[in-house]
Design a protein with these regions (language model features):
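Residue-level marker for the onset of beta-strands and adjacent loop->beta junctions
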Residues: 11, 33, 65-67, 169, ...
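Beta-strand secondary-structure signal
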Residues: 44-48, 66-68, 77-81, 114-116, ...
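Structural motif
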Residues: 14, 21, 44, 75-77, ...
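Extended, loop-rich substrate-binding clefts of extracytoplasmic carbohydrate-active enzymes
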Residues: 20-73
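Acidic, contiguous internal or C-terminal segments within carbohydrate-active enzymes
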Residues: 51-98, 104
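Acidic-aromatic substrate-binding/catalytic surfaces of carbohydrate-active enzymes
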Residues: 1-21
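Well-ordered beta-strand positions
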Residues: 16, 38-39, 70, 83, ...
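Active-site/ligand-binding surface loops and adjacent short beta/alpha elements
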Residues: 102, 106-187
Length: 187
């Protein structure tokens, strides 16, 4: 799903802006809304979500959120563009929760699969989660060996691995032979 205008869960499912309290569920509302087809040409397609009175009641800003997908051989590029159509500064965050089959080929056991974190070689900072979905800062770090982490049972159970700032520009899932079968690049 697309996470907009919030990434994460606000405390008590609400936030304050200019002295007023607004309701907001985990990761905002875009993931629960229907986007309109904006354009389709060749191997590209664009969708748009425009603010409504319903969104304005939760998020007091007028906007247009454009999401484009382009297919090029075995690669899919995703592009986000946010237009502030209001007359005031607009505060937002945007993110995604892509999901990939692991292990590949319907195998049952993830043992031996790894994650490679691009040019990051030693460790990745990560966050814990509260039961209601809020990310909490921890001092924990995922130790990497030559930029890789072994996926073990329970690897994703207790925390969220967030790639933030300039920690790395790509993450790959490696099969048991060490071959990347999915790579996500971002900038």
């Amino acid at each position: 799903p697309v996470l907009f205008p919030f990434v994460g869960a606000p405390k008590n499912k609400e936030y304050r802006y200019e002295g007023r309290t607004y309701p907001m569920g985990q990761h905002g509302f875009a993931r629960d809304m229907e986007f309109d087809l904006e354009a389709q040409e060749g191997k590209s397609i664009w969708f748009v979500l425009s603010s409504t009175e319903e969104t304005y009641a939760k998020y007091p800003f007028r906007f247009r959120l454009h999401i484009g997908y382009t297919l090029d051989e075995n690669e899919v590029s995703v592009h986000w563009k946010v237009d502030n159509t209001d007359e005031k500064p607009m505060y937002f965050s945007i993110g995604a929760h892509p999901a990939f089959l692991c292990p590949i080929n319907g195998e049952q056991d993830k043992t031996g699969y790894r994650l490679r974190f691009g040019d990051l070689t030693d460790k990745l900072h990560h966050h814990g989660n509260t039961p209601d979905g809020m990310a909490v800062m921890t001092d924990e770090e995922l130790e990497l060996e030559d930029g890789e982490a072994v996926i073990t049972p329970g690897f994703f159970d207790k925390c969220t691995y967030m790639v933030e700032g300039a920690q790395t520009g790509e993450v790959s899932i490696l099969d048991r032979d060490g071959e990347a079968y999915v790579t996500v690049r971002f900038d």
